[in-house]
């Protein structure tokens, strides 16, 4: 079936289904506290839960940057298999958390987008930039776990 000549469906056409339990997913950025982030029903319609959601997304982004710039992932000075497994586990955790932040941003909520970017920026400033590093930090060997 050729759909090339059909007009794109509008967001309002998605609402006119007979199933009243369907929730419309935003396809453009919007501002407001009534949204769902990551899980069905969370944060709901409460302003307090929305603020908690923003704090969680911010902290997840900071943690991703911390893990990305941690000495565990650099792994200089040692080549043991145990440390390689720890590096792999930390990398896997970092990647999983980064995907959670990405999925939160895919809610198209403007507040979530802003706190995610702010979290990555603060995390990079604290752990990745030279603003808070000693000059000798990059020369330190891989620490014992």
Curated annotation (Swiss-Prot):
Q: Which InterPro entries match?
A: Cop_transporter (IPR007274)
Q: How does the UniProt record describe the way this protein sits in the membrane?
A: Multi-pass membrane protein
Superkingdom, natural source = Eukaryota
Paired cysteines (S-S): none
Q: Which GO terms describe its cellular component?
A: plant-type vacuole; plasma membrane
Among the record's GO biological process terms, what is one? copper ion transmembrane transport
Specify one Pfam family: Ctr
Which terms does the record give in the GO molecular function aspect?
Answer: copper ion transmembrane transporter activity
Spell out where the chain crosses the membrane.
Answer: 47-67, 99-119
Localisation? Membrane
| Main localization of the protein described in the UniProt heading | membrane
Q: Which UniProt keywords apply?
A: Copper, Copper transport, Ion transport, Membrane, Transmembrane, Transmembrane helix, Transport
Q: What protein family is recorded?
A: Belongs to the copper transporter (Ctr) (TC 1.A.56) family. SLC31A subfamily.
Chain's role: Involved in the transport of copper.
Question: What name does UniProt use for this protein?
Answer: Copper transporter 6
Q: Which organism does this sequence originate in?
A: Arabidopsis thaliana
